Amino acid sequence: MRSVTKYYLHGVVLFATGCAGNPDAKRLYDDLLSNYNKLVRPVLNVSDALTVRIKLKLSQLIDVNLKNQIMTTNLWVEQSWYDYKLSWEPREYGGVEMLHVPSDHIWRPDIVLYNNADGNFEVTLATKATLNYTGRVEWRPPAIYKSSCEIDVEYFPFDQQTCVMKFGSWTYDGFQVDLRHIDEVRGTNVVELGVDLSEFYTSVEWDILEVPAVRNEKFYTCCDEPYLDITFNITMRRKTLFYTVNLIIPCMGISFLTVLVFYLPSDSGEKVSLSISILLSLTVFFLLLAEIIPPTSLVVPLLGKFVLFTMILDTFSICVTVVVLNVHFRSPQTHTMSPWVRRVFIHVLPRLLVMRRPHYRLDPHRSRFAGLVTGAGETTLWDEGSPGVPAPPRPPPCAPPLAPCAACAPAEAPALCDALRRWHRCPELHKAIDGINYIADQTRKEEESTRVKEDWKYVAMVLDRPFLWIFTLAVVVGSAGIILQAPTLYDERAPIDVRLSEIAYTAAKPRPPPPR
């Protein structure tokens, strides 16, 4: 408690000593501002123009709102001019050459931001001004401006924006206040480095490329006098890592899923479901994009083109998938395969697409049974391919029995004669053979139907294969053609904010090792 009281008393003593020990500054302040009229422009003659110089020192690029087209900046507005009423002789005031006075007590140029979007048009914080014995007045007030900025979203998110800040006197014309840049060179109205970036905190979203300043003279319809302004152009290039990771890469991944629709087998029943799911995902991306960019109808942003291109591809893939599924599930009862379809999609295209169809094999037991039944229904019950054994014709059911061995000689086939005698005497066997013939006919029809269905499935598979390659090529070429349109991808200019900012240099400079 004693130490706090000691420091407090020490500060009071120093303050009192400073106030009492600087009578020259107090006397100078009283002499300068006792009869000073801050409402009158400080010129000797009314026709004289007062030169006011201005410069911006950018401290922070707070935000660039794309949707509302507003740039928010934190900067210092450096202004200087000569006021003949605020000059003095230092020898008469104890060698005092500089004096700090409240800016509210002196004349100030009404410099405002013409393209103000929100808030105050002029500086609201009235900081102190610095007076020099020569009459030079310097005033550096800080301010946070929200300026309107025309956003060009054509190449978003690989875009480059140029936002302007137009400063000028609201009341005085060019014949009364000659507005110029502090670093302006005689004979030119352009200053290449019009904004001071020495105290700039680098932005995590934008790189500063150029900051020129241009002096303009403009005539309005209301007045004959010119009105001067200094326009500061801030050219920025977006850092694309955030949007690349969160928008571009997911959208490209979804676009490549469109290709997999044609690789998915039709029997899975999920081809259309996958396409519609992709379409819904792209719709969500489109809604997110609409929340970011301004509602302009002049251009379509690059990311919007990419999402729209992918949506069109996915919609077309749904149409193709429906056609492929229609072909896949065809049957002999609904469609007949034309000869040219069989020739093109079964014999020609598979060779061109390097497709090999697996050989379709029926059940060997069913095939052997069908052949045996067919032979029995037409001739006899033995293998008709046996060499040396002719097949006798089948007599009508109501015909009288043949004489024994009338069809062949006993020496050639005695077993055949015995079989014929037994067969003609067994009517139940005729009914069994008729039933077997019916089953054989149904089996043949089923196998033929299966063969036709497999042919249609193969045609659908052949249809899927060229569209697989077509969509793969379309996605790769289309994505590259859209994304690579952005000129910032080929812009190799180094940002000047990192080079000129002393704060960024100090932060990037490695710390020395601690002493041992």
From Swiss-Prot:
Compartment list: Postsynaptic cell membrane; Cell membrane
A GO cellular component annotation in the UniProt record: postsynaptic membrane
Alphabetical list of PROSITE patterns matching this protein: NEUROTR_ION_CHANNEL
Disulfide bond annotation, renumbered to this chain: C149-C163, C222-C223
Signal sequence, renumbered to the chain: 1-21
InterPro entries named in the record: Neur_chan_lig-bd (IPR006202), Neur_chan_lig-bd_sf (IPR036734), Neur_channel (IPR006201), Neuro-gated_channel_TM_sf (IPR036719), Neuro_actylchol_rec (IPR038050), Neurotrans-gated_channel_TM (IPR006029), Neurotransmitter_ion_chnl_CS (IPR018000), Nicotinic_acetylcholine_rcpt (IPR002394)
GO molecular function (one): transmembrane signaling receptor activity
Keywords from the named record: Cell membrane, Disulfide bond, Glycoprotein, Ion channel, Ion transport, Ligand-gated ion channel, Membrane, Postsynaptic cell membrane, Receptor, Signal, Synapse, Transmembrane, Transmembrane helix, Transport
Topology class, membrane: Multi-pass membrane protein
UniProt-listed Pfam families: Neur_chan_LBD, Neur_chan_memb
Keyword Cytoplasm: no
TM region positions: 244-264, 274-294, 306-326, 466-486
Cytoplasmic side: 327-465
Positions of glycan attachment: N45, N132, N233
Residue spans, topological domain Extracellular: 22-243
NCBIfam families assigned to the protein according to its UniProt record, in alphabetical order: LIC
Function as written in the Swiss-Prot or TrEMBL entry: After binding acetylcholine, the AChR responds by an extensive change in conformation that affects all subunits and leads to opening of an ion-conducting channel across the plasma membrane.
Protein family: Belongs to the ligand-gated ion channel (TC 1.A.9) family. Acetylcholine receptor (TC 1.A.9.1) subfamily.
Protein name, entry field: Acetylcholine receptor subunit alpha-like
Species of origin: Manduca sexta (Tobacco hawkmoth)
Native organism taxonomy: Eukaryota, Metazoa, Ecdysozoa, Arthropoda, Hexapoda
